[in-house]
Amino acid sequence: MAEHAGRRCCLGWDFSTQQVKVVAVDAELNVFYEDSVHFDRDLLEFGTQGGVHVHEDGLTVTSPVLMWVQALDIILEKMKASGFDFSQVLALSGAGQQHGSVYWKAGASQVLASLSPDLLLHEQLQACFSISDCPVWMDSSTTAQCRQLEATVGGAQALSCLTGSRAYERISLVSSFAASLFLGSHSPIDYSDGSGMNLLRIQDKVWSQACLGACAPHLEEKLGLPVPSCSVVGAISSYFVQRYGFPPGCKVVAFTGDNPASLAGMRLEEGDIAVSLGTSDTLFLWLQEPTPTLEGHIFCNPVDPQHYMALLCFKNGSLMREKIRDELASSSWSEFSKALQSTEMGNSGNLGFYFDVMEITPEIIGRHRFSAENHEVSAFPWDVEIRALIEGQFMAKKIHAEGLGYRVMPKTKILATGGASHNRDILQVLADVFGTPVYVTDTANSACVGSAYRAFHGLAAGTDVPFSEVVKLAPNPRLAAAPTPGASQVYEALLQRYAMLEQRILTQTRGPPE
């Protein structure tokens, strides 16, 4: 097809929980091709639900590794059939669902290096994996091992680490496994995804001997040395050159995790924060100096090796907002917005905590309402309740972000995504609580697009070009809300009260802190 011909580009891949996706991005940073394979729908023979198998114990959750390989075959064949011009691909990179692991058999590297272009990948790699069903991020079958690791290294964050005596040649994350397919050899783990394993010392970017020793013997040689996330890990395998027409000089840039790739796709810069307002709410933070705590996850930054990124997840997100909307605003977002418009910033000192499911950050359940005098009350007027919910959700986000070392800077901007980002009144509260402007951007396929951006950055990284320079042509986000004058004074005192009351609830439910 003509529209796919003659455009020099980079490819971005995303090996996510439910599908494999690809985008092609040209030198002007326009997405001009995208495709996907959905595991449940397009690969019925694997019998997955939501891309996974949940085992009888209810704790073990796995995905068939050959399903991921076959999905890649299908997409590449579809691209070929559509007339996609692979000869124009300068580089590629990708993302993988975080915390999944792939176990290569001894001898797999020889198979990867000598693939026949006459056969599909999944036809040749069937005997290459020690474990055919890979544990993924939803797996919680290793709780005992996590506790043991914590005890061994004196309170390290939990790690799902399988041990055993099988002949593993190499252990990959989903990201480095996918890169290995394109490379024709074992790809190293990148710093950013590697820092989600609780085995990497994030300050000096080397494996922690204490954590490795707590998990399994000879683990370091199975993992290989980690590399910077913008590294070119090699040229594409001759298999792809011969079967699809990739140029021999096409570079493979280290693959990373889906969350770090999304940070790249949203083009966060130093001091920025992204808020994904979905079923659960997730914060992406760009940090200079992290303050590791028992909350959240801190990773090496995928686009700046000197800095860090953090993730904070809040379970009571859109479902909680929708529940209050249905209870108090006649299931109408416009009525919900009227409540926010008719109540004042700071809600006359009334504060609320709304956790219908056990929250992660912090570990609280239930609804708790407090008057301006910090007395717990049983109910608020309907409009006060709605503002208390939204203000409380955003104050919690700011407090816990600051707990990880985040500080609002003069040039800070918030990027809002997800369903609630379409409601300007909710975004106004977000701007007021944080005291910084809120922007919205189209982040469909952000991990995929971020991977293509990272491929361009990998091509330029040898010259120390900053990521922001590489992606300056990408579409700019749109301003959605600016802080109301006087907002910072209103919320400065409220934030202190909110943190104090949160601690009071925690103490009441689980006793005083040790």
Where are these regions (language model features)?
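Active-site core segments that coordinate phosphate-bearing ligands/cofactors
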Residues: 2-5, 11-12, 21-27, 86, ...
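A generic structural motif
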Residues: 37-39, 137, 298
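A conserved helix-loop-beta module that forms one wall/lid of the active-site cleft
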Residues: 216-228
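Generic hydrophobic, aliphatic-rich segments that mediate packing or membrane embedding
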Residues: 68, 88, 97-100, 130-133, ...
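Conserved beta-strand scaffold positions in the cores of enzyme catalytic domains, especially
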Residues: 36, 134-135, 226, 252, ...
